[in-house]
Amino acid sequence: MKTFVLLPTGEGRTTDDLQFLEFSAYVERALTARGYQKATDFASADLAIFLAYGIGDPQTDTYTYTLPVWGQTGVASSTTTGNVNVYGNTGTYSQTTTNTPQYGVKGYTSHQGSNTSFTRHAYLTAYDLVSYREKKKEIVVWETKIESAGSSGDLRLVFPVMIAASRSFLGISTGKIVVVNLREDNLPVLEVRGLPIPDGKAKKKE
């Protein structure tokens, strides 16, 4: 079983950083599920795993769409009724025409909308500490790059979902980009967050 220490990377980040402490707990649970064990200290660790994370600037895309305008488009039918009134040698005639309107799409209106999205990322890079102690060489054992895009700009909300999505692939080579779709209430996310598992959610093997 490989032991590890998890360290932050990025300007101004330390192991005492509150956000790192929160995020590292998610990563540690994911690594434990993959068979890794958190080392008691740096000297006893087999791997030093560096965690980088961040979120990009919002990107807004605009689009145009049309909506139908409903209304009267014509006359479907007409009905005419008449009356004849006779007074002696004189008669009058009157008539009434009733039109039944026809309704449908009489045109379209143009509108504009927009979508704002954020790109979120988390990078995990594992270095071989045993080799470093013996040969003073920095050897990367494995690296996992996680990226997601969506409407949420709250990295704290999205981060555990990203880690849960990558959990099955930590420490292995996928050979390609892997796309994973998860929701906040999916089992891997609940496990990474350390939340109680509701009844009815069976444990899935990774």
Q: Each predicted region: which residue ranges?
A:
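Surface-exposed short loop/turn segments
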Residues: 51-134
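A structural "domain/chain start" motif
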Residues: 1-34, 39-45, 56-63, 181, ...
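Generic structural hydrophobic/aromatic packing signal, biased to beta-strands
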Residues: 6, 49-51, 124, 166
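Envelope-exposed proteins and targeting segments
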Residues: 2, 27, 34, 45-47, ...
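Low-complexity, flexible helical/coil segments
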Residues: 38-44, 84-90, 160-162, 178-185
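A structural detector for beta-sheet-dominated domains
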Residues: 7-9, 52, 87, 149
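General N-terminal targeting signals
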Residues: 23, 55, 66-68, 157-159, ...
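C-terminal/domain-edge helix-coil "capping" segments
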Residues: 101-206
